[in-house]
């Protein structure tokens, strides 16, 4: 049987602050024996969909960004699968995405939300 951790977190407008919270949640979940951790929608930002018309371009994250690498490294270092949700930008097009990162730190799946 797989132990799954669900992360509920209070987000701010600071990507770096929310990333630190997310990495700590990965570490905590792994220490508690979870094999998979799931995160809330757009976890690295304030929940901007509730503010229509707001400029959110600064929240875009490229797939090869240090932020994504930090999630991959944390999953690998803690031997846990992780599903972060980010405002990803590929080919100039932003979208809400959940990434499936395996315990080796590799992105093995992606879902547009």
What are these regions (language model features)?
Residues 1-5:
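Extreme N-terminal starter segment of soluble prokaryotic enzymes
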Residues 6-8, 84:
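Structural signal for conserved beta-strand scaffold positions within catalytic alpha/beta enzyme cores
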Residues 8-14:
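Short polar catalytic/cofactor-binding loops
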Residues 15, 24-104:
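Cys-nucleophile CN-hydrolase/nitrilase-fold catalytic domain and related Cys-dependent amidase chemistry
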Residues 111-113:
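Conserved small/polar residues in nucleotide/adenosyl-binding loops
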């Amino acid at each position: 049987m797989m132990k799954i951790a669900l992360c509920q977190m209070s987000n701010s407008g600071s990507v770096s602050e929310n990333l630190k919270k997310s990495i700590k949640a990965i570490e905590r979940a792994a220490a508690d024996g979870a094999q998979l951790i799931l995160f809330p929608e757009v976890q690295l930002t304030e929940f901007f969909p509730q503010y229509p018309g707001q400029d959110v371009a600064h929240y875009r994250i490229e797939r090869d960004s240090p932020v994504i690498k930090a999630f991959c490294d944390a999953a690998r270092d803690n031997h846990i699968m992780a599903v972060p949700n980010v405002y990803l930008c590929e080919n100039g097009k932003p979208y809400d995405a959940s990434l499936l990162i395996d315990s080796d730190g590799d992105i093995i799946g992606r879902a547009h939300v």
